[in-house]
Amino acid sequence: MTDKPFWQTKNLNQLTRSEWESLCDGCGQCCLHKLQDEDTDEIYWTSVACTLLNPETCQCRDYPNRKKTVPDCIFLTPEIVDEVDWLPVTCAYRLVAEGSDLYWWHPLVSGSPETVHEAGISVRGKVTAFDHDMQDDDDYLDHMVTPDKIAR
């Protein structure tokens, strides 16, 4: 009998810190700025990345200190995964919370951190600007995209 991987046997609250961190697929989509319509609460995606995102690796340049540098950085926890409605449908945290399995390209499944990029899921090659390039809020409108433009 083969043991099932941890993401198939545990819920998010049961994960160790190491398991939690490994669940991130490294796509970088959570590091893109989203706009929210004040009237409808609809979420709009942009191709503007957080200043800390490395657009090639799709990893944070200063992960341990990100909240100090970027105070409004979302610190995902098991408690808020269900509340964050802009998480991509491909997000492993969302998938596990919903009781779904990970996709073939997830590094925990494929064994390679490159498959998330090869599958076109990551933001590699899709970042058009960084938040420090934006002069005012209206500048973000020039970089609005549909989520399918981010993940193939």
UniProtKB/Swiss-Prot annotation:
InterPro entries referenced in this protein's UniProt entry, alphabetically: Puta_zinc/iron-chelating_dom, UCP006173
Family according to the record: Belongs to the UPF0260 family.
Protein name, UniProt field: UPF0260 protein BAB1_1496
Organism for this UniProt entry: Brucella abortus (strain 2308)
